[in-house]
Amino acid sequence: MSRFTGKKIVIIGDRDGIPGPAIEECLKPIDCEVIFSSTECFVUTAAGAMDLENQKRIKEATEKFGAENLVVLIGAAEAEAAGLAAETVTAGDPTFAGPLAGVELGLRVYHAVEPEFKDEVDAQIFDDQVGMMEMVLNVDEIIEEMQSIRSQFCKFND
């Protein structure tokens, strides 16, 4: 059973990293529900902050389904952007600009190149959808950043 089985999934892909549809494809064989998927330009957003509309959607999804049932998957091209997005859905919007300012959701959040995602999905689909970008991204830096954010702010230890 996958860590995503039975979960509601929010995908925030990145135009310059892993796009939303690629992450979605990886999840198709798993019994989970993608409730929202987008592909953003993390570099384009103000200071790399998470899009305000996405913050609103994540807040509403958490209220509707419960934090324990929600997982956020990120495809950011850079560790810093991934960290900002992860911090936003765990500790609240660090820019204090959006609906998640001061709101500690503590959600499970993973990057598409982390083993927590990669090891849970079909290897062939992952290779086809994410493999090329995995070769050019600084995976170690992304993993380190994501683990740091989760260890500080995630309310779930699985």
Swiss-Prot record:
One Gene Ontology cellular component annotation held by this UniProt entry: glycine reductase complex
InterPro entries: GRDA (IPR006812)
Active site positions, chain numbering: 44
Annotated keywords: Oxidoreductase, Selenocysteine
UniProt EC number: 1.21.4.2, 1.21.4.3, 1.21.4.4
Any one Gene Ontology molecular-function term assigned to this protein's record: glycine reductase activity
Chemical reaction(s) catalysed: acetyl phosphate + [thioredoxin]-disulfide + NH4(+) + H2O = [thioredoxin]-dithiol + glycine + phosphate + H(+); acetyl phosphate + methylamine + [thioredoxin]-disulfide + H2O = sarcosine + [thioredoxin]-dithiol + phosphate + H(+); acetyl phosphate + trimethylamine + [thioredoxin]-disulfide + H2O = glycine betaine + [thioredoxin]-dithiol + phosphate + H(+)
Pfam families to which the protein is assigned, alphabetical: GRDA
Function statement: In the first step of glycine, betaine and sarcosine reductases, the substrate is bound to component PB via a Schiff base intermediate. Then the PB-activated substrate is nucleophilically attacked by the selenol anion of component PA to transform it to a carboxymethylated selenoether and the respective amine. By action of component PC, acetyl phosphate is formed, leaving component PA in its oxidized state. Finally component PA becomes reduced by the thioredoxin system to start a new catalytic cycle of reductive deamination.
Subunit relationships: Monomer. Component of the glycine, sarcosine and betaine reductase complexes, together with components B and C.
Family: Belongs to the GrdA family.
Name of the molecule in the record: Glycine/sarcosine/betaine reductase complex component A
Organism the protein comes from: Acetoanaerobium sticklandii (strain ATCC 12662 / DSM 519 / JCM 1433 / CCUG 9281 / NCIMB 10654 / HF)
Lineage start: Bacteria, Bacillati, Bacillota, Clostridia, Peptostreptococcales
